[in-house]
Regions:
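Ligand-binding clefts/hinges and TM-proximal coupling segments of bilobed small-molecule sensing domains
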Residues: 34-35, 160-176, 219, 223-224, ...
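Periplasmic-binding protein-like
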Residues: 52, 127-135, 215-254, 272-287
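Acidic, polar ligand-binding/catalytic clefts
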Residues: 74, 78, 83-147, 222
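A ligand-binding cleft/hinge motif common to bilobed small-molecule-binding domains
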Residues: 93, 110-118, 164-171, 190, ...
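Extracytoplasmic small-molecule ligand-binding "clamshell" domains
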Residues: 33-109, 248-249, 268
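Ligand-binding cleft/hinge of the Venus flytrap
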Residues: 60, 73-82, 161-185, 215-217
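Extended ligand-binding regions for polar small-molecule ligands
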Residues: 70-79, 139-160, 235-274
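Short helix-initiation/N-cap motifs at beta->coil->alpha
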Residues: 86-96, 140, 180-194, 230-232
Length: 287
């Protein structure tokens, strides 16, 4: 009988130990399952990635990040009631950075590309993102987008503009028209504007809202040429697993659209208004 009692005591001790270990692993599992949105709310702060060299969406003025996108972000942060740490990063580090967990989400304009929509969770759009071309004012050598054959085209490195420029050149070659003289890539778009003004390149490829503002602010220097793509949009993105954060951001953008705040900000920063859809803007297979 004594042996049975001792055996039972050993068994009970082991059972308690195993239960404690399982409980510990369960608690660790619960903690690791916390979403980014839950973490933001729990800690009362968020870190976001921005390229503040993309006027008028985000740019530096008097040492601070300002712009259309910043005003949208401020509206959302006020609703969350958390502390904001907004990082100003080169575009080339933005998308890899969010996937690596260096910040919570991308609060800068991301164009819709087939290779991106399967890697990142896109919010609803914040603006139109159709890719256009801009030339020097009065450059009679270039009157249509087909006239880019033999010309020097400039855009941003690793941007949607780069991908679309390469795709359009391939189409020109397929039609037997030939390609560009060169495709020059810049770290930030403002560098390409300067290169165009100085005659180093013949055309800048970028999204329409940005180029329209550049033309408006520099009359007699630049002209819009033509669209390079069909109508598209620009959004913010999160990591693919952060769909609750993506959905929250989308809900606030839609709220701003419906209460007139987006149009108010568009009037302020662009001087014209854009209609923002809440469905049908992403290609098949998007997250």
């Amino acid at each position: 009988m004594g042996k049975i009692c001792k055996s039972w005591e050993v068994f009970s001790s082991k059972t308690i130990l195993i239960a404690a270990v399982l409980a510990l692993f369960a608690s660790v599992g619960t903690a690791s399952a916390e979403t980014t949105l839950e973490k933001i709310k729990r800690t009362g702060k968020t870190t976001v990635g921005t390229e503040a060299a993309f006027p008028p969406f985000e740019f530096i003025k008097d040492g601070k990040i300002v712009g259309y996108g910043k005003d949208i972000l401020d509206y959302i942060i006020a609703d969350l009631g958390v502390e904001l740490n907004q990082l100003d990063l080169p575009w080339q580090g933005i998308l890899p950075g969010v996937l690596a967990g260096k910040f919570d989400f991308v609060a800068t304009s991301v164009s819709i590309r087939p290779e991106r929509v399967v890697k990142y969770a896109y919010t609803v759009p914040i603006a139109e993102g159709t890719v256009w071309t801009m030339k020097r004012a009065g450059d009679d050598r270039i009157n249509s987008i087909d006239d880019l054959v033999g010309k020097v085209v400039g855009t941003q490195l690793a941007s949607g503009g780069e991908a679309n420029s390469k795709e359009f050149e391939a189409k020109l070659k397929e039609r037997g028209l030939g390609g560009y003289k060169a495709l020059k890539l810049y770290t930030a778009y403002p560098e390409s504007y300067l290169a165009l003004a100085n005659g180093e390149i013949d055309v800048v490829v970028q999204t329409l809202p940005n180029l329209a503002v550049v033309v408006k602010e520099h009359p007699g220097v630049f002209e819009l040429l033509d669209a390079m793509t069909g109508k598209s949009y620009m959004c913010w993105v999160t990591r693919p697993e952060d769909t609750d954060l993506r959905d929250y951001l989308s809900s606030k953008i839609i709220e701003m659209r419906d209460n007139g705040k987006l149009h108010e900000l568009q009037d302020k920063w662009f001087g014209f208004r854009m209609e923002i859809p809440d469905s049908g803007f992403l290609p098949a297979g998007a997250l």
